[in-house]
């Protein structure tokens, strides 16, 4: 019941923000935060590079890394023309940015992709570690953002504690952190 209420709350928040437009920028890997910093300085723009928690074997700690390397997500109530103007004024010539679009004027993110992204990430735009157990050689998530998404897990790497998800998102394969509870 709690999960259903949580999903419903996220859906309502998404519907309340229908006047927001989502954009996807492609940039150089490792320059995502630099691009976000510039974009956030512009009024009416929220930019982020999603992160994910993962288990680092050497340090034996949960750490953060970029979920989609080279991608920056922008949310704004500004029009496409206004946002394009801000993108074109990007001051750092050494950092390449390119807006991804399906067609001339259609953002590269579908409503379904936006819904998935907002459901899985927390308010800090981090996909938190999930926890689960093995049942019949298949992982069953009991805690975390992947609860009730067992059917989307197509592979589990026990050694690195990473699950591969069968989600269509920017033609990327989702590898997310899942730790087995012993």
State each model region's role.
Residues 2, 8-135, 155, 164-182:
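Acidic-enriched and Gly/Ser
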Residues 144-145:
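Short, surface-exposed secondary-structure boundary micro-motifs
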Residues 137-139:
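Generic structural signal for buried aliphatic residues
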Residues 149-155:
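Short beta-strand-centered aromatic/proline hotspots
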Residues 160-162:
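A generic structural signal for beta-strand entry/edge sites
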């Amino acid at each position: 019941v709690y999960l259903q209420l949580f999903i419903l709350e996220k859906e309502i928040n998404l519907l309340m923000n229908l006047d927001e437009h989502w954009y996807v920028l492609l940039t150089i890997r490792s320059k995502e935060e630099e691009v976000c910093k510039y974009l956030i300085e512009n009024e009416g723009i929220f930019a982020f590079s999603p992160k994910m928690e993962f288990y680092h074997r050497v340090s034996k700690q949960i750490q953060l890394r970029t979920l989609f390397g080279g991608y920056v997500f922008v949310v704004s109530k500004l029009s496409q023309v206004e946002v394009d103007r801000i993108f074109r004024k990007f001051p750092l010539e050494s950092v390449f940015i390119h807006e991804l679009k399906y067609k001339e004027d259609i953002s590269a993110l579908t409503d379904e992709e936006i819904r998935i992204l907002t459901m899985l990430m927390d308010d800090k735009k981090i996909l938190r570690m999930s926890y689960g157990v093995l049942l019949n050689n298949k992982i069953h998530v009991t805690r975390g953002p992947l609860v009730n998404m067992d059917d989307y897990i197509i592979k589990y790497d026990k050694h690195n504690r990473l699950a591969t998800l069968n989600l269509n998102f920017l033609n990327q394969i989702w590898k997310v952190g899942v730790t087995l509870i012993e």
